[in-house]
């Protein structure tokens, strides 16, 4: 997996943010960028996925994830991203809704073609 992120950092398709307190990492989050086919308005769109949002248990409920998430959203806006998506646990739903994320209008389906993928 680290090869994927290293490539993303090298080609500017991955943004990582780390929160520290007294030299100790207390939270982090990432943004993956990808170009998608366009429509009648544009040839292509830049979209992003928020991933790996995490705050260590002792640092939770202090706004760290909110700060990281807002910085990732601002970075996405600066880069011209048209849409952000993410997968979340029940615990994270409130955070994502609080900054404007909604469930998609259309159901999302997937077909796993590799039985090694979770």
Feature roles, as predicted:
Residues 1-16:
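Active-site rim helix/loop that mediates acceptor-substrate recognition in acyltransferases
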Residues 18, 24-33, 49, 54:
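Conserved beta-strand in the GNAT
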Residues 33-38, 85-87, 93, 97, ...:
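Conserved catalytic-core motifs of GNAT/GCN5-like acyltransferases
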Residues 40-45, 63, 87:
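Residues at secondary-structure transition points
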Residues 41-57, 109:
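Conserved acetyl-CoA binding element of GNAT-fold acetyltransferases
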Residues 59-71:
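Conserved acetyl-CoA pyrophosphate-binding loop and the N-cap/start of the following alpha-helix
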Residues 69, 76-88:
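Conserved GNAT acetyl-CoA-binding A-motif
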């Amino acid at each position: 997996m680290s090869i994927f992120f290293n490539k993303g950092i090298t080609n500017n398709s991955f943004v990582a943010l780390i929160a520290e307190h007294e030299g100790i990492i207390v939270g982090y989050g990432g943004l993956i960028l990808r170009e998608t086919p366009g429509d009648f308005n544009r040839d292509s769109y830049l979209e992003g996925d928020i991933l790996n949002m995490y705050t260590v248990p002792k640092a939770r409920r202090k706004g760290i994830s909110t700060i990281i998430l807002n910085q990732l959203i601002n970075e996405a806006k600066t880069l011209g991203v048209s849409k952000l998506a993410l997968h979340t646990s029940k615990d994270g739903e409130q955070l994502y809704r609080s900054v404007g994320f909604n469930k998609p209008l259309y159901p999302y389906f997937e077909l796993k073609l590799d039985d090694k993928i979770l």
